[in-house]
Amino acid sequence: MANINRNNLGAIGEHQVLSRLLLLGYQAAITNMSVDNMENIDIFCRDSQNRYAAIQVKTTLANDINVGINHRKFFDDNGNVDLAAGLEYLESKIVGPWVMVQVSGTDSDPLFKFFIMSRKQVIEMIYDSERWYLTDFNRKKPLSGNGGIYLPIPWLYGNGVVANNNHKEWINPFSGHSFENQWQNLWND
């Protein structure tokens, strides 16, 4: 695929999700069309039962999803790991379900994969993987809290990470469960 700037990539993902929601029979609108870059919400959606979802869309060309949060949120002011503070931050920032879009293929024949997680599932996945990353690695020097948090695409298929000399095993809290095309997760919490 050609070099796509970040804003265009985000718009591509949002429009693909919007199209899919409309095809599924939902009423949906991209919030950024009427509200200037509404934080944490990209699409409002309503189903036939008048349930609403405030959806965050994350789009990638890579094999992982940048969740838009850095490790610093899981540290206290003294630089110590503070998982409770990280969880509190996740619960305040993540306001609804997420649809993660992986774009591949070519410019003339793009392919889109959709991974749908409820708000609760997103929080649990990020929290548990961050707990593992911050506490179950053999590090010679402590982390500074810099750097972004990513969810590798294999994790969205329910895969974990085997132990090695650098870290303990990470057992995916959704082991064996694929989030691909799980649109019903929009309505779960």
Language model: regions and residue ranges:
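Mixed-charge (Asp/Glu-Lys/Arg
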Residues: 1-39, 44-189
